[in-house]
UniProtKB/Swiss-Prot annotation:
The gene is iad. This is Sex pheromone inhibitor determinant. Acts as a competitive inhibitor of the CAD1 pheromone. IAD1 appears to be a component of its own signal sequence. It is found in: Secreted. Residues 1-14 form a propeptide. The keyword Secreted applies. Keywords: Plasmid, Secreted. Transmembrane segments: none annotated. It comes from Enterococcus faecalis (strain ATCC 700802 / V583). One of its GO terms (cellular component) is extracellular region.
Length: 22
């Protein structure tokens, strides 16, 4: 996976985790 894609995916994962935990 390219670093450019990672930069887009990481915030989405973070948001998903925050939604689950919160």
């Amino acid at each position: 996976m390219s670093k450019r894609a990672m930069k887009k995916i990481i915030p989405l994962i973070t948001l998903f985790v925050v939604t689950l935990v919160g």
